[in-house]
Amino acid sequence: MARVKRGVVAHAKHKKVLEQAKGFYGRRKNTIRTAKAAVDKAGQYAYRDRKVRKRAFRSLWIQRINAGARLEGFTYSQFIHGLDVAGIVMDRKVLADIAGNDPAAFKAIADKVRAALA
């Protein structure tokens, strides 16, 4: 049976890990053992934070809608309920954008909500 030497494969694996660890601080960028641990942990953080990002943006949109709604005399929950009653189907991302960038359009939506709740 032929002898298997894996130096080339090991070098390629190490190179891959060190490329992923580029930009890390201290030994984490150039010592294979610490770099591998740091890259693994970075992957865990990245996976977790892809989930957290969705929550964080939804929270931000709700805050912006709430601010716009309060200028029109509603609380956030009253405003969302009014949208439902009025039959206006619009997601929070779009509502937050309208509240921040187009106050006239948001006022028109708020007037429709006010009419639906009256």
Curated annotation (Swiss-Prot):
GO CC annotations on file: ribonucleoprotein complex; ribosome
The keyword Cell wall biogenesis/degradation appears for this protein: no
Keyword Transport among record annotations: no
Gene Ontology MF annotations: rRNA binding; structural constituent of ribosome
CDD domains: Ribosomal_L20
Signal peptide limits: none
Keywords, comma-separated and alphabetical: Ribonucleoprotein, Ribosomal protein, RNA-binding, rRNA-binding
Biological processes annotated in GO: ribosomal large subunit assembly; translation
Entry-linked Gene3D superfamilies: 6.10.160.10, Ribosomal protein L20
PROSITE patterns listed in its UniProt record: RIBOSOMAL_L20
Family the entry assigns: Belongs to the bacterial ribosomal protein bL20 family.
NCBIfam families named among the record's database cross-references: rplT_bact (TIGR01032)
Function recorded in the entry: Binds directly to 23S ribosomal RNA and is necessary for the in vitro assembly process of the 50S ribosomal subunit. It is not involved in the protein synthesizing functions of that subunit.
Record's protein name: Large ribosomal subunit protein bL20
Organism ancestry: Bacteria, Pseudomonadati, Pseudomonadota, Alphaproteobacteria, Caulobacterales
Gene field: rplT
